[in-house]
Every structure is written in structure tokens, then in C-alpha cells.
């Protein structure tokens, strides 16, 4: 299928949320804003459903995941093949990735010293998952649908729960399964869109899927807002 009439490979942006290339816009696009918010919502839902809730712990967890997932993971991803076609220098991407990942790990270590040393298990797991998934280390064995669902769905939700509860119960596994299942749905929808935009240079067949992804983003974020708001009452 070729590009739509009047649309060329040069005018098809690599993602529905991508800004026009160049300068600060490349950095905004790099963050994948809708999807970063979507996956941060899993942290909030996990924390909000835990038996004990501390707003400060949630905020620190969100900060750590924003650095690790929103910045580091996406910077590594752009280093590995330039899927967003940004003009950000590779050196700047590498610095952003390692500084952000180090910042996230620092938050995690400080949190573990204050709230419980078992958090270090999650810190270590995150420090491995971010480069392993996005740089396709270990032969790319983690870079698949289930790797995405577990790393960017189940893991944030389970971490959000553990930050608050310092233990794992059935409910924690259930919320992790929710996040993994929704992430699989996201991946199923976004894969053909990425292929159309980035490999084929066409928007044909993307409109309905992308509209669905937009609404799912809003739904995920609003669920997180509702859960946290209920705990703050």
C-alpha cells in the first residue's frame, strides 16, 4: 500500500503525537508524551490500590519512572535505530539516557533506605530492563509483545503497589495483570500504526486505530486520577 494521495514519506510523521522535527520539538517528541502518561498511570493505580497510601511515596515513584521510562528508555530507543527520526545528537541521547537512569536509580536507593530495602530488587530490575528492552540486548529476547507488557505494564504497577505496601499480595498481582493486559492491547494496536508510518510512509488504515489509542490514553490516565483522588479523601 503506497502513501495516501498528497501525503509523502517526508510528510508522514513517525508517530501521531510527533511534533514537527527540530530543536526542542524533538525532545518533546522523544518523551512519547501520551504513552509516558499512560504507563505512569500504572504506577499510580498500583499505589492507589495498595492497603496503605502515602502521597509522597507515589510522587517519588512517579518521578523515578518518568526519568527511567519517559527519558532514559526513550533515549535508548532513539539511539537504537532512530525510530522517531529526531536530529538529537547521539551523544546528547546517551547523556540523557544515562543521567536519567542514574537519577531514577538514585531515587530508588534513597527510597529503599527510607522505606524498606526490598525496594532494591525493583531498582535493580528497572536498571536492567530499561537498556535491555530498548537497546535490544540479549539478542532482543525481551523486545517483544510480552516483554513490553511485563516491563512497561506489570512492572510499573507492581512497583507502585510495593512502594506503598512493602509486600506483595494477590491484589498486587491482579493489578499487575491488568496493566500487562492493557499494555498488550496497546502494543497490538500500535504495532501496525508504527509499521505504516515509519516503514511504509503511509497513513492509510491508521486513523481509527490512533483514535482508539488516544481514548485509551485518556481512560488510563483518568482511572489513575480517580484511584488516587479516592485515596486522598
Across the structure, where does each feature detected by a protein language model lie?
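Membrane-helix interface "capping/anchor" motifs
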Residues: 135-146
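Hydrophobic alpha-helical transmembrane segments
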Residues: 6-86, 92-130, 150-233
